[in-house]
Amino acid sequence: MDEMNALRGFLDEGTKGTRTYIPRRKDSEKLQIISVMNFKGGSAKTTTATHLAQYLALRGYRVLAVDLDGQASMSAMLGHQPEFDVGENETIYGAIRYDDQRVDITEVIRASYLPGLHIIPGQLEVTEFEHDTPKVLADKTQAGSLFFSRIGQALAPVADVYDVVIFDCPPQLGFLTLSALCAATSILITVHPQMMDVMSMSQFLRMTADLLRVVSDAGGSTNYDWMGYLVTRFEPSDGPQNQMVGFMRSMFGTRVLNNPMLKSTAISDAGLTKQTLYEIERSQFTKGTYDRALESLTAVNSEIEDLIRKAWGRV
């Protein structure tokens, strides 16, 4: 990867005008912050966020992945085991906590094994924010910014260092998720095309809209460049799933991404060894299984990349 990025830089040096080989944002283009979220577990939220972060880094973008989920599955897949590698005050909580133990965000950012991809790992400590915030809200005398602005303010010092930030949000609508939503420029909602999952998503969206309205009235930012629904774990031969996807498209229109993420044993088997499809050896699967999964994943991530580029005015 280092050699590939060096080659991209060399080719761009000989190109006049707009950069062609290095896709990094210009000074006039704002940092893209994507919140990947859903209220219901099993929607492939973490799988989506992790593969998207790796894809963008492989494409040459400077990416920061932020694990906001106490389960810390994204951290584990990116080489940081929460039980052994992540200590106290080494998560995003360390940079947004309310007391005098708060640290600068640069102290919790780590490199991953992939050039261009950094991570703020997670572990159970991040849930402390959910317990601290009600106490602060009740204590009118305690100084500090409101909860919904803390992640955005923490990221501000490193905004110029990255092109894209990706939040893997917890599967709950708490204070941490709301803070991530206020820091975000875009929202990606993963949904499994089953009736119960879509019903759960509907309730989640209704609750989110109500809470964001309150946050907006209090001064929080809720303006987004784009909002998309990604169909995950999709089985093309499943009739009811196809009907549900059709229903979603009739309800949400073009906000539903054109490309679904296919259900594949290649993705789930790679997860057994805490790897992504971009890391696992093709020889470990039948060629058809691996190729179909990779083609689906690349199509999804390429479509999301186009949304990012559109927000920058490039498409």
State what each model feature region is:
Residues 1-315:
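P-loop NTP-binding core
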